[in-house]
Amino acid sequence: MDIKNKVALITGGASGLGFASAQKLIAAGAKIMVMDLNEDNAKKACSELNGEADYAIANVAEEASVQDAINKTMDKFGRIDIVLNCAGIGSASKTVGKDGAHPLDYFKIVLDVNLVGTFNVLRLAAVEMGKNEPEKDNECGVIINTASVA
């Protein structure tokens, strides 16, 4: 895929792997929508990116929040060509600690962001990507999912 003038939606794009990816993609000529939960960090990331970038505040685990971010991307850039899922959280708790078992609610939050959130973004973005005119290799876009222990 030729990156020049492509639109990339990057979850967790205000820091870490997401921000580093945004820097590489924008250097290759892409337009970037930073999707992040933290508005201050997202603003700062966009100001540091040397190119066409904007941000959308969203919780990847919430359908309406993600749809709003996708709508903002479509309004701003008219398309989505690349989705890069980098949003993720971790829990710094032992499975069994001094106070007993790791709270299950903490683990459910991690799953909501890291698993449900990733699927939520890709399924909603894929709807818009499917509307793209296929390129010479019949490609309408690419979705990249990452995983880590945050």
Protein language model features and the residues they cover:
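Residue(s) in the substrate-gating loop at a strand-loop-helix junction
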Residues: 148
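Hydrophobic positions on the long internal alpha-helix
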Residues: 69, 84, 121-125
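Amphipathic alpha-helical dimer-interface segment in Rossmann-like NAD(P)H-dependent oxidoreductases
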Residues: 113-137
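The beta1-alpha1 cofactor-binding region of Rossmann-like NAD(H)/NADP(H)-dependent oxidoreductases
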Residues: 39-40, 57-69, 104
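Conserved glycine-rich Rossmann-like NAD(P)H-binding loop of the short-chain dehydrogenase/reductase
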Residues: 28-44
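Conserved NAD(P)H cofactor-binding loop of Rossmann-fold oxidoreductase domains
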Residues: 86-94
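Canonical Rossmann dinucleotide-binding motif of NAD(H)/NADP(H)-dependent dehydrogenases/reductases
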Residues: 3-32
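Catalytic Tyr-X3-Lys loop
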Residues: 89, 100-120, 144
